[in-house]
Each structure stands twice: as C-alpha cells, then as structure tokens.
Amino acid sequence: MVIGLSHYLTVSAILFTIGVFGIFLNRKNVIVILMSIELILLAVNINMVAFSAFLNDIVGQVFALFILTVAAAEAAIGLAILVVFYRNRGSIAVEDVNMMKG
C-alpha cells in the first residue's frame, strides 16, 4: 500500500478539525486554545509539504519552515504572556484576560 496525497490531506483535515473544535468547545483555558492553534498550523504545514512533494516543488517545504518558525515564536510569546498573567492574577481563565490593561 502506497501512501498517497489523499492520505496526507485526510490527516491534515482531521488535525485541522480537531484544532477548530478545540477552540470552539473549550473557551475557558488559554493553554488549550494555544494548543489548538498549533494543531491548525500543523495541519497547514502538512498540506504545504504534501502538495510540495506531489508537485515536485520545494517552495512549499520552504514556506512550511517559515510557518514552523512563526508558530514557535507564537508559542513562546504566548506562554510567556500566560506566565506573567498567572503571576499577576493567579488564574489563566479566558474571562479574566479581557480585564488586562494596556
């Protein structure tokens, strides 16, 4: 059995759907929302690499590396903001986030 483009797209669609459901079903925990965003970005990366390999073009793979870099920076900044917010408020509930000053 050969793993083809449709298999990669199916896995990507499943990951994207899980990420979207994670955002809509769990609106109380910021960490779960950040992890769901990372799942969505991972699904996009799988699509980029799958189509890049299918079309024998390296541009999709290079673009996926840029997306991974942005996702890593987003995760680091998001977690740093959460740590500071938790130290100040004692909670990371989404309801408390809209009370931030700035």
From Swiss-Prot:
InterPro entries: NADH_UbQ_OxRdtase_chain4L/K, NUOK/Mnh_C1-like. Keywords: Cell inner membrane, Cell membrane, Membrane, NAD, Quinone, Translocase, Transmembrane, Transmembrane helix, Transport, Ubiquinone. One of its GO terms (cellular component) is plasma membrane. It is a multi-pass membrane protein. Its EC number is 7.1.1.-. It is an enzyme of class 7 (translocase). It catalyses: a quinone + NADH + 5 H(+)(in) = a quinol + NAD(+) + 4 H(+)(out). It comes from the Bacteria. GO terms for biological process: ATP synthesis coupled electron transport. The keyword Ion transport does not apply. GO terms for molecular function: NADH:ubiquinone reductase (non-electrogenic) activity; quinone binding. It is found in: Cell inner membrane. The chain crosses the membrane at residues 5-25, 31-51, 65-85. Disulfide bonds: none annotated. Belongs to the complex I subunit 4L family. NDH-1 shuttles electrons from NADH, via FMN and iron-sulfur (Fe-S) centers, to quinones in the respiratory chain. The immediate electron acceptor for the enzyme in this species is believed to be ubiquinone. Couples the redox reaction to proton translocation (for every two electrons transferred, four hydrogen ions are translocated across the cytoplasmic membrane), and thus conserves the redox energy in a proton gradient. NDH-1 is composed of 14 different subunits. Subunits NuoA, H, J, K, L, M, N constitute the membrane sector of the complex. This is NADH-quinone oxidoreductase subunit K.
